[in-house]
Amino acid sequence: MDILQFPINMLNYFYEISGVEVGQHFYWQIGGFQVHAQVLITSWIVIAVLLGSATLAVRDPQIIPNGAQNFLEYVLEFVRDLARTQIGEEEYGPWVPFIGTMFLFIFVSNWAGALFPWGIIKLPHGELAAPTNDINTTVALALLTSVAYFYAGFTKRGLGYFGKYIQPTPILLPINILEDFTKPLSLSFRLFGNILADELVVAVLVSLVPIVVPIPVMFLGLFTSGIQALIFATLAAAYIGESMEGHH
């Protein structure tokens, strides 16, 4: 009974985490729900940038790629190699779109927060920021990753997937269950904490010292933002590969 209660308590904990707020926020009231408008607006902008860039890059495909098409193919090869390394040569193919979507959305979101002056867009309450600056976004991305590796393991190994929870001994059942629920927790907090801290440091420096001084910190933030996107995508692919590795 306690073992069954633990996942329920963890889900309740994630629900409480999703209500964490830093600063003021702008909400839309849709029916009986409050929707976090800041996250939706900036997420839609990031999605539009990604879709627009991809459309422009492939609107006139060439046999010998150049310009935007060449860059897009380089990104695709990078994501494909990442998925192949973490998931395995035989199984990585179907997961390239998922890993690529995660990587590109997080990467562009992080850089949007570091490069775009969101403060010039005025809202009734609060201000716009990178989507990954909000824990609701990072928790959602982490939960999607959890669903993905549960799905990968179950479809590959069937009911035998759940046998991993009692290996190497049934005594470790609670710990193995805890491990699966802490994976999305660590993913979400790592991404949220790094992006929020970077934006706060830059904001404080800009308010205290001339604009030239924070520039090195801003460049460091760009580097950190890219690394965080890579870490998230790498861990997501590694979790998916791990969930399927007991098949052979």
From Swiss-Prot:
Compartment(s):
Plastid, Chloroplast thylakoid membrane
Membrane topology according to the record: Multi-pass membrane protein
What GO terms fall under cellular component here?
Answer: chloroplast thylakoid membrane; plasma membrane; proton-transporting ATP synthase complex
Query: Please, which domain of life does this record's source organism belong to?
Result: Eukaryota
Q: Is DNA-binding there in the keyword field? A: no
Q: Where is this protein chiefly located?
A: plastid
Kindly give the Pfam families that the UniProt entry links to this protein.
Answer: ATP-synt_A
Q: Which SUPFAM superfamilies match?
A: F1F0 ATP synthase subunit A
A GO molecular function annotation here is: proton-transporting ATP synthase activity, rotational mechanism
Annotated membrane-spanning segments are 38-58, 96-116, 135-155, 200-220, 221-241
CDD domains for the chain: ATP-synt_Fo_a_6
Which key words are in the record?
ATP synthesis, CF(0), Chloroplast, Hydrogen ion transport, Ion transport, Membrane, Plastid, Thylakoid, Transmembrane, Transmembrane helix, Transport
Q: Which Gene3D superfamilies match?
A: ATP synthase, F0 complex, subunit A
| Cited PANTHER family | ATP SYNTHASE SUBUNIT A, CHLOROPLASTIC
Biological function: Key component of the proton channel; it plays a direct role in the translocation of protons across the membrane.
Which family is annotated? Belongs to the ATPase A chain family.
Q: What do we know about how this protein assembles, alone or with others?
A: F-type ATPases have 2 components, CF(1) - the catalytic core - and CF(0) - the membrane proton channel. CF(1) has five subunits: alpha(3), beta(3), gamma(1), delta(1), epsilon(1). CF(0) has four main subunits: a, b, b' and c.
- Recorded protein name is ATP synthase subunit a, chloroplastic
Organism listed in the record? Cryptomeria japonica
